[in-house]
Amino acid sequence: MILASVLGSGPRGGPPLRPLLGPALSLRARSTSATDTHHVEMARERSKTVTSFYNQSAIDVAAEKPSVRLTPTMMLYSGRSQDGSHLLKSARYLQQELPVRIAHRIKGFRSLPFIIGCNPTILHVHELYIRAFQKLTDFPPIKDQADEARYCQLVRQLLDDHKDVVTLLAEGLRESRKYIEDEKLVRYFLDKTLTSRLGIRMLATHHLALHEDKPDFVGIICTRLSPKKIIEKWVDFARRLCEHKYGNAPRVRINGHVAARFPFIPMPLDYILPELLKNAMRATMESHLDTPYNVPDVVITIANNDIDLVIRISDRGGGIAHKDLDRVMDYHFTTAEASTQDPRISPLFGHLDLHSGGQSGPMHGFGFGLPTSRAYAEYLGGSLRLQSLQGIGTDVYLRLRHIDGREESFRI
């Protein structure tokens, strides 16, 4: 019946579901030949994806292969070559690895309960993955730099195509929320899908960045990352959002190992830090609505050692109610009013675009911010923990393993 949905007719002859790729295609005559050609091309593209529902053998074979995860150290010390051979090696690794990882996620979409998998928005994301698999597997073997350059164009296109996947998944699950009976199954699906997406984007962006000659960077790895500087960048961003919504924002004090520098990948911090800072600022402002221009500071402490980096964010936002404490790290698919839920659970700052530059798309709303940050931290060999002092405030502990520390690093 999923196939019937893709083809445009509902189950058992019911009303047609919204097609996966936006407006329904119509092959009726158009007033101009250009319009006709456009729609024929769209129909042809869509037919390829539909055909894949019949012929899944390539996806099935790829899904049975294990992914080959790299440590950041491997990526950092793979070296540069004058003849560009490091780029060919990196591209060939991606050409082998990306289809396998995408096939794993397609298998994950198939495992969803039928009624959820039929949701048009979820189907749209499912199709994005199938289309990506087809484009990647159709690409010929990379033999020279010209092939590698064309492969980079494909990778950029796919990164752009998938930039809104987090928001789409949240919307689709919100639309299907009344059909969700096993929340553990959905949480497992989301954890795997979102962390796999992070890994794929990190690997793909790393390869593209290898073409750049940026000081203190090898690909996406910063060789001298300053936690203080990246925190300050996102503090400024979160304060602007907070001022836009509330007319004011808490001051932020940073202490601890403020001079620390070490090799690290900024990208996961660029996903996680805005969420944690927005949470702290919103909780602070919401709990001081009577005195919005006299609010307590948010305090951030950096602790660096030879195994991991710990960032503690402490707010005086009243803490988390006992009834909400056990579920703040769960994915929530409702949009309840802030007056009836802890600010960390309800959508954060409405639906503003929270990531300038569009690097990751908005990771907000629908109660996805904290659980997604938790999943990312765990994927990177770390953790995200909350300690609530009800009536006072909340301490959030973000722990991330070093890529060149005394213990084995995480794998991407």
Curated annotation (Swiss-Prot):
Give the PROSITE patterns listed for this entry.
HIS_KIN
Report the record's Gene Ontology biological process terms.
branched-chain amino acid catabolic process; lipid biosynthetic process; regulation of acetyl-CoA biosynthetic process from pyruvate; regulation of glucose metabolic process
Which EC number(s) are documented for this chain? 2.7.11.1, 2.7.11.4
The reply on keyword rRNA processing is no
Q: Give the main localization category.
A: mitochondrion
Disulfide bridges in this chain: none
**Record's catalysed reaction(s):** L-seryl-[3-methyl-2-oxobutanoate dehydrogenase] + ATP = O-phospho-L-seryl-[3-methyl-2-oxobutanoate dehydrogenase] + ADP + H(+); L-seryl-[protein] + ATP = O-phospho-L-seryl-[protein] + ADP + H(+)
Q: Which InterPro entries match?
A: AK/P_DHK_N_sf, BCDHK/PDK_N, BCKD/PDK, HATPase_C_sf, His_kinase_dom, Sig_transdc_His_kin-like_C
User: Which residues belong to any copy of the Histidine kinase domain?
Assistant: 159-404
The residues the record assigns to binding Mg(2+) are: N279
According to the UniProt record, one GO cellular component term is: mitochondrion
Residues that hold K(+) according to the record:
V328, D330, F333, G367
Compartment(s) where it occurs, according to its Swiss-Prot or TrEMBL record = Mitochondrion matrix; Mitochondrion
Identify a single GO molecular function assigned to this protein.
protein serine/threonine phosphatase activity
| Top-level taxon of origin | Eukaryota
Subunit comment: Homodimer. Homotetramer. Dimerizes through interaction of two opposing nucleotide-binding domains. Interacts with E2 component of the branched-chain alpha-ketoacid dehydrogenase (BCKDH) complex. Competes with BCKDK for binding to the E2 component; this interaction is modulated by branched-chain alpha-keto acids. At steady state, BCKDH holoenzyme contains BCKDK and BCKDHA is phosphorylated. In response to high levels of branched-chain alpha-keto acids, the inhibitory BCKDK is replaced by activating PPM1K leading to BCKDHA dephosphorylation and BCAA degradation.
What the protein does comes down to: Serine/threonine-protein kinase component of macronutrients metabolism. Forms a functional kinase and phosphatase pair with PPM1K, serving as a metabolic regulatory node that coordinates branched-chain amino acids (BCAAs) with glucose and lipid metabolism via two distinct phosphoprotein targets: mitochondrial BCKDHA subunit of the branched-chain alpha-ketoacid dehydrogenase (BCKDH) complex and cytosolic ACLY, a lipogenic enzyme of Krebs cycle.
Q: What is this protein called?
A: Branched-chain alpha-ketoacid dehydrogenase kinase
